[in-house]
A protein has these predicted regions:
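Amphipathic alpha-helical and helix-coil boundary elements used as assembly
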Residues: 1-204
Length: 204
C-alpha cells in the first residue's frame, strides 16, 4: 500500500493560489534550510596549512543556528590558503567543495541548514517498477581519460523514472551494475508522485 513520508522540508519562497475546475490549488516554491547560509556576504581568511575542509566548514557555519556539515568520506587538509571575500557562506562553501570535486548536497529531510560535503552514504535499495529509462553519458570522461586510467563504463549513467522513493546516495543494482542515486527529481503527475533519478557509477 501507500506509505507516508516527507518529500521536502524547507522554507516557502513563493506561494500562488489559483482556481482550476472549481478547485483551489496552491503552487508553492520552497527552498532548503541552506538558504540561511546564503543571506549575507562575509570576509574570512583561512591560511593554516594544517586546517581541514571540515574544520573550515564548521567555522563558517558556526554563527548559523542549527547548521551542520556532514562529511561522508575522509577529511583532508587544505595545504594552503582559502579566502572568502564578499561571498555568502553558501557560495564560499560551494567553491571550497569544488576544489575537492564534490557537490554540496542539502539535507532536505530537515528545515535546518544541514548539508553534506559530497553525496551522503545511502542504503542498498530496490528500484521497483521502472516507468521509463534514458541512457546518458558524462562528458567529463574525455577530460580525464587522457590523464589517468578510467573505465568508460563508469561514465555511463541512466535517468530512471519510477514510483519508488529513494534518497541521494542510495545504491541500486541496474543493468548488472551497482549505481548511486546522484540526482533526484520529484513530480506530481496524474495524481501520483513520480520520481526521476540519475543513476551513476562512483566516478560520476
Amino acid at each position: 500500500g501507500n506509505t507516508a513520508g516527507t518529500l521536502f522540508s524547507g522554507y516557502p519562497e513563493k506561494v500562488e493560489i489559483k482556481e482550476e475546475r472549481g478547485y483551489r490549488i496552491a503552487d508553492i516554491q520552497a527552498v532548503s534550510g541552506t538558504i540561511l547560509l546564503d543571506q549575507k556576504k562575509s570576509n574570512r581568511v583561512f591560511q593554516k596549512k594544517v586546517q581541514t575542509y571540515m574544520g573550515i566548514a564548521s567555522t563558517v557555519t558556526a554563527d548559523t543556528e542549527h547548521s551542520a556539515c556532514i562529511l561522508p568520506g575522509s577529511d583532508m587538509r587544505t595545504g594552503g590558503t582559502l579566502i572568502q571575500y564578499q561571498e555568502t557562506d553558501w557560495r564560499f562553501l560551494k567553491r571550497m567543495a569544488s576544489q575537492l570535486g564534490l557537490p554540496l548536497v542539502p539535507d532536505t529531510s530537515y528545515y535546518y541548514p544541514r548539508f553534506y560535503l559530497g553525496l551522503p552514504e545511502g542504503e542498498k535499495r530496490e528500484l521497483g517498477e521502472i516507468i521509463s529509462c534514458d541512457l546518458c553519458f558524462d562528458g567529463r570522461y574525455y577530460a580525464v581519460s587522457g590523464k589517468c586510467l578510467v573505465d568508460r563504463e563508469d561514465f555511463i549513467c541512466y535517468d530512471v523514472v519510477t514510483r519508488t522513493s529513494l534518497s541521494l546516495g542510495d545504491r541500486v543494482t541496474y543493468e548488472g551494475r551497482e549505481l548511486l542515486v546522484s540526482r533526484k527529481k520529484t513530480e506530481l503527475a496524474g495524481g501520483e508522485v513520480i520520481f526521476t533519478y540519475r543513476l551513476a557509477g562512483n566516478s560520476y
